[in-house]
Each structure stands twice: as structure tokens, then as C-alpha cells.
Amino acid sequence: MNQQLPRFIRPLLAAALVSSGLAAEAQGSGTPAPLSLQIINHGPASFHVNSVLVSGAREAILLDAGFTRADALRVAAAVLDSGKKLSTIYVSAADPDYYFGLEVLHAEFPEARIVAAAPTLKKLAAALPTKLQVWGPRLGANAPRQPVLPEALAGNSLSLEGQTLEIRGLDDSLAHRSYVWIPSIKAVVGGVNVFGNLHAWTADTQTPAERAAWLAKLDGIAALQPAVVVPGHMLPGTPQDLTAVNHTRAYLQRFEAELPKAADAAALIATMKAAYPQAGLGIALEIGAKVNKGEMKW
């Protein structure tokens, strides 16, 4: 025990002691540790959807649960690796790629409360039977077996170790599509409102008024002047800043302009592919074009 440490170890140990000392000092002074974000970016089969783990010194909140059982297991692994206690799972949207993973996560973390804003929960619960009918056979063993529903969130914020996560976007015609603003780190987790380097999913916004409300949400995000923006869906390597907000806004404006000009969905698809040749998630364009040209029901 009294053997001298190798020289290369000494600076590392000293740095670790200083770091732990500073952390203890901050904790002792009542200053909360800065929150951190970990993005779990699910693959193309899950529409490139993101789950985001927001961590404090001891506890964490998960934003969105993933689409498949496999997605949720990867999220669970990230939570376990973090060493933090998962206090809350928040579901920001009523789409199945945001909540199908809840069953697995509830089994792994039964003490974590699972919540969604009331408009999200209302739409989610109403659509659940149809979503299971559509996606259950497609996902097979990766589908939920006994779906878990969130509870309605009281108020419009979450708290993590004394720091607030504000739930925004609840006061418009797309109130079921929220986003999260974390003022202490000037970060937005954009949910289904923000797409990074992808075709935006327009099948669920079938009127000009709904798409205008979507654009207004993007303006609301930009007005916060966030330092960090995590898209709800993104290709790997997408910058976590306002780039994705600007991309989504420009995409919707172009879609709105081209929609009445296109003779049919095929023409609209061709035009948007030419305008965004590098964008992923082609299925979003294909379904969105067919739905908005009246060639498909959604």
C-alpha cells in the first residue's frame, strides 16, 4: 500500500482529486451541477428518431422512448452506463416512434414516472389502437406487447436537481407536438418539430394552417436563441444548433410552394428530391406527398 505510484499516474490522480474536490465544493455551496445531454440516435428503420438523456449530478430525465424494443434497450443501456437514477420519462409527441419503447423502459426502470403533456396524451391514446394495427405486424418481435401509456403532466415543466425543463409549444393548433427548452444550458430538444438533414414528415400536417402552425413553432424555437438544438429526427453528424431549425423551415416553405404546382404526388416527390438531393428519410417525402395530394389516406 505504501508503494510509490508510477510517475504517469500521478498527474491523472491529482486531476481526478481536484475535479472531485471542485464538484464537492459546488455541491456544498448549493450550486447545481450543469446539466448534460446525451443523444441516442436511432437508425433509419426507426425514422432516425432521437432519444435524449438529460443528466444532472445524480439523476436524469429521458426525453422520448424510441420506436422499437431494440431502441428502448439501447436507451436503457445508456441510462445504466450513466450511473444516474432515471427519475422521469417525458414523451414529447403522439407518434409511435416517441413512445412505443415505453414498455421496455418501464420494465427496466419501474420507479421512473412516465408523463406527457395533456394534448399529447389525448392524441396518443386515441390513435394507439390504429398505430398498433399498422405497425405491430411490421415490427414483429420488436413491437410493444403490452403498451404503456404516460400519465398527464401537471403543469408545463419538469425539474431536475433544481433546474427547470420547460415544456413549450402547447398553446397552438399542434399542441400535441411539444418541444423542451432548458434555459440553464440554453438548449432546445425539438421533438417532431425539427428535422436534421432529412425530408420532413408532412403526412400529419395536411392543411396550410397546420403547416403554418409548424412554422410558427420553429420561429418560437429560434426566438429563444438556443446554443444547442437537438432535432427530433436527424442523420448522424447533424450539427446540434439552429441549422436543423433553418433546414426544416426552408423545407416546409418549399413544400408549401410546390404542393399546388405539382400535378400529382410523383411530380411533387421529384421536385422535392431535386431540391434536397442529400436528404434522408425518403419515406417521409413519399407518404407526405401522397397524403397531401389526396392520393393516400393517413
Language model features by range: what are they?
Residues 32-81, 85, 179-192:
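Conserved beta-strand hairpin/beta-sheet module of binuclear metal-dependent hydrolase folds
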Residues 44, 58, 65-69, 90-95, ...:
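A mature extracytoplasmic/lumenal domain signature
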Residues 67, 168-172, 176-246, 250, ...:
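Metallo-beta-lactamase
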Residues 27-29:
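Boundary of Sec targeting at the N-terminus
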Residues 2-13:
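Bacterial N-terminal signal peptides that target proteins for export
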Residues 81-159:
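Active-site HxH/HxHxD metal-binding segment of metal-dependent hydrolases
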Residues 19-25:
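N-terminal signal peptide c-region/cleavage motif recognized by signal peptidases
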Residues 123, 223-228, 235-298:
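Accessory terminal helices/loops
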